[in-house]
Amino acid sequence: LAEYYLSKKHKVSGCDNLIGGTLDNIDVNKINFFKADCENLDEMTKIIKDVDVVVHTAAYPHEGLSSFSPYLICKSNYIGSISVFTAAIQNNVKRVVFCSSMARYGDIETPFFEEQKVRPVDPYGVSKLAAENTLKILADTHDIEYNIAVPHNIIGPKQKYDDPYRNVVSIMTNLILQNRRPIIYGDGEQTRSFSDIDDCIFCLDKLITDKNINKETFNIGPDEENITINELYKILCNKLKYNEPAVYVKDRPNEVKHAICSANKARKYLDYKTSVTLDESIQKVIDFIKSKGAKKFTYNYRLEINNENTPETWKKKVF
């Protein structure tokens, strides 16, 4: 997104604590970059000055982990979001665009529609939904514009691929390139829909710049190519010429079996269209990881609850 706006000759600032990314992903000579944590309100208030629009994409996006490190995940995702919203309002920012998560929907009938009654099933989803609702209240109180994006399973180059808790395409690719058998939780028949980052940018741009779109929530991503984890693994094996079977382990608690969003509203109001196929998206991820080289997985988050319900793969740091 930063690269897109730089190409349009906008001035872009960015803020990240780099726990989920690296400086290699950005050109610090073109972007006014701040290494800071969004939970720090004083820092955010200093950083968000002379800014027209704030796009809040920062999160600890660990849906499964949130049931075992709930304090860490909720503190980052809720308090961090409120800190950003508060600093934006204090600095008279015109518009805030918040990237929520499809975890807001929980375990309800698919496809997920923006107007559905939601029922998040994990602390991560609850924290994202709470941040959405707080933004709505603050925006109404202080008369600022806002939009909420609900992307689902975004994949693409520059994604952190040594994180053992998230990004199934990257995790499996990183393991296979190390000649290690990937792990599948449950029976592998979970269905997901993956969003190529390039197909998300145009929609986000509309939420950021279109004056006629205000105080709206949009699912962002395709609904044409749903895939099971088993099918995904077969694609990766084929592309990487890998012939070993996956290792199947116990389901992770609170994992939604089928998570598919409708793109109807985005098609109607944001002119959304899928231009990158899932096969192409997966290939881009593979090419990126190959160019950087396989990495040892890093466990950056402490398990706050370690008991019989905690996945053994995390307790034993299997990855």
Give a label for each model feature.
Residues 1-151, 309, 319:
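N-terminal Rossmann-like NAD(P)+-binding domain of SDR-like oxidoreductases, especially those catalyzing
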Residues 39, 68, 76-79, 122, ...:
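Residue-level signal for the nucleotide or nucleotide-sugar donor/cofactor binding architecture
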Residues 54, 200, 204, 220, ...:
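Non-catalytic, hydrophobic alpha-helical segments
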Residues 129, 142, 154-170, 180-181, ...:
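Glycine/proline-rich active-site loop of Rossmann-fold NAD(P)-dependent oxidoreductases
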Residues 130, 134, 138, 168, ...:
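Hydrophobic alpha-helix immediately C-terminal to the catalytic Tyr-X-X-X-Lys motif of short-chain
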Residues 187, 215-219, 230-233, 241-258, ...:
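C-terminal "lid/loop" region of Rossmann-like NAD(P)-dependent oxidoreductases
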Residues 278-319:
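Amphipathic terminal alpha-helices
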